[in-house]
Regions:
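Beta-strand-rich domains and repeat architectures in extracellular enzymes and scaffolds
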Residues: 35-67, 83-95, 245-247
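Surface-exposed loop and turn segments in beta-propeller and other repeat-based domains
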Residues: 36-38, 79-87, 163-172, 208-224
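A short helix->beta-strand "capping" segment at the edge of beta-propeller domains
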Residues: 26-43, 73-80
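Beta-rich, blade/repeat-based domains predominating
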Residues: 42-53, 86-97, 127-140, 170-184, ...
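Blade-loop segments of beta-propeller domains
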Residues: 76-113, 121-131
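Short loop/turn segments that connect beta-strands within beta-propeller blades
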Residues: 72-76, 115-119, 155-158, 200-204, ...
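Hydrophobic, well-structured mid-protein blocks that either form specific transmembrane helices
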Residues: 111-169
Length: 268
């Protein structure tokens, strides 16, 4: 997503949800410790991210050259890539499923399935609404579309089976972006904020909020409004959590640290 498409009223509503409102004592708030810092391609407008077998897989926008990539974690070297065709498509979230890689596009209601090893296109599929992000839980694909809804898809037919509505203190959470399945929960970036929400996949209730304010040093920030936090990857074998952002020069392995439950959101 790019900022110019967000109406002023919608942006104001999003900021209002995360501004100056204390989180309920029932909703834990987490800060972070940086475990390790890795390089990240500053030209990569990150839309999707996952970790698999020692490598990072990343999808990037915007127009006219969206890509899917396989990258070396330690060096950020692009080992393999494929441009999204035609160039009028805006690439969005990606996820692995068995021997395939599945990709969404933003507003064209078209998704793609590739061979995971070669990035050879295998087929297209369609869905209603926008496509923002994908993850999976070993038996379903999980999709966000920029609304408070999280959709669950049959991984073979790629058709929706059910959905949940994500709420924080009873209020719907808009602009859910990049997703990752972590320890039985859905982690989701909230677009244009410094926050990741931990979502109960059965009820949609936010079980915790991760505040990543200050993660990228000011000296590394581009100053471009939409170069924001976006991108979550998880290495389940070693319990490593990675985060980055659009056109960020760094990718971080972080450890969550519980903060006071009375912490307030202070904007994004």
């Amino acid at each position: 997503m790019i900022l110019r498409t967000l109406p002023a009223a919608a942006l104001a509503a999003l900021i209002a949800l995360f501004a100056a409102a204390p989180v309920s004592a029932a909703v834990p708030v987490y800060g972070y410790q940086i475990v390790h810092t890795y390089p990240h391609d500053r030209k990569a407008f990150t839309e999707g991210l996952f970790y698999l077998n020692g490598y990072l897989y990343e999808s990037t926008g915007p127009y006219p050259r969206s890509q899917i990539r396989k990258e070396d974690l330690a060096t950020a070297k692009v080992l393999q890539s494929r441009d999204l065709a035609p160039s009028s498509l805006f690439g969005e979230g990606i996820v692995n499923w068995k021997t395939h890689l599945v990709q969404l596009t933003w507003q064209t209601q078209i998704g793609f399935v590739y061979d995971l090893a070669t990035f050879k296109p295998l087929k297209r599929f369609t869905y209603p609404g926008e496509g923002w992000a994908l993850t999976q839980n070993d038996h379903e694909l999980v999709m966000s579309d920029g609304t408070p809804a999280i959709r669950f898809l049959n991984p073979d037919s790629l058709k929706e089976t059910h959905r949940i509505t994500v709420t924080l203190d009873g209020r719907p959470v808009e602009r859910l972006n990049e997703l990752e399945w972590v320890r039985g929960e859905i982690l989701a970036n909230v677009w244009m904020t410094n926050y990741i929400v931990r979502i109960n996949p059965t009820t949609g209730v936010v079980a915790g909020v991760i505040d990543l304010t200050g993660l990228l040093p000011a000296s590394d920030q581009s100053g471009v409004t939409d170069d924001v936090l976006n991108g979550i990857a998880y290495d389940a074998k070693t319990d490593r959590l990675f985060v980055t952002g659009k056109r960020w020069p760094k990718l971080f392995e972080i450890r969550l640290v519980k903060k006071s439950q009375t912490a307030s959101f202070t904007g994004g």
